[in-house]
Amino acid sequence: MAKIILKKGREESLKRFHPWVFSGAIAQIVGEPAEGDVVEVYGQDGKFLAAGHYQIGSIAVRVLSFESGVINDDYWKSMLSRALAVRIATGLADSETTNCYRLVHGEGDNLPGLVIDWYDGVCVMQAHSAGMFRAKKQIAQALVEIYGDKLKAVYDKSSGTAPFKAGLDLVDGYLYKKDGFNDNEQVVVENGHKFIVNWTEGQKTGFFLDQRENRALVEKYAKGRNVLNLFCYTGGFSIYALGAGATHVDSVDSSAKAMALVDKNVEIGSFDKSRHTSLCVDALDYLRDVPEDKYDLMIVDPPAFAKHRGALNNALRAYQRLNAAAISKVAPGGFVFTFSCSQVVTKEAFALAVFSAAAQTGRKVRILDRLNQPSDHAVNIYHPEGEYLKGLLLYVE
């Protein structure tokens, strides 16, 4: 096994259990590790610090363990069992009203580079590192062992997330299928609401599970209101609003595929179609042209405006423009649920962008709640970068 020797003084982050080793911290590589190999990390004093997946790039090692010798044949089953135990402890894995959740959330479950979502018997995984991609068969086998007969399939959807320069064969496909299972989509239930999830053609793993608790919060406020759901994707917030008794819901997204799924979700929910309109248009263009006071509840949940620090300033300006448009148009006494899923945008920076937006409109705005990601998207306390989803619930006079 290859060894990574750190520069003097660069071991402190590992001693604080941060799960990344940056390339600039490395003094020497002993051996010739391939991308995705498990390597051991040592300080200048020769003491073992961690073991993890090696990769060429800014993050050179993603730590799998701070103990020596534990990455063995039982490792994957042990780690996935621990992740499942947390979902059982929080009541999510055996919920009577929800049968979809995130099983593995990367660093939050001490498995950096790996995401696994559970959709009522189907596990959809995405590898964000060469090491996790190369371990996908072992991961699938471990899922079979921990779920048993409950598991219908394991689908690998890493072609858009794994590093394409690492020489990997990035083709999506099934790693396991139970006899007789031939579906690429199915209906799942979240807090009693039905949704169609297509893991082969949908974005990410097929559904944005990280907004589950925030969708439930929208449900509390939507009764009797005219609702606008911007960047709606498959209409998660829209379905909750309809279920709450919203007077009317308009769902807006630029993706025709997404809008088709919104309509299907409205249909399987048995909602009165006259209470919902799907609009396949640019969200910001629509918001600029919409009459003032038409909506008294808005959801503003755009895709990540910044995926790296170089795009941060442009992203903050985009959040300011978007939120200024929403705050200026919402009816007096209305609510705005606004979000950022950009990891590089901090809670403080996002709040400042929204403050600037509110000041630009001149309206009186209260923050009623600060919104986050749910328990199955846990944040490793030693890896604060994992807290990527942030939101504000605004009341606008």
Locations of regions flagged by a protein language model:
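S-adenosyl-L-methionine
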Residues: 257-299
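Non-catalytic substrate-recognition/targeting regions of SAM-dependent transferases
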Residues: 104-111, 115-117, 133-207
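Mobile active-site "lid"/loop adjacent to the S-adenosyl-L-methionine
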Residues: 296-325
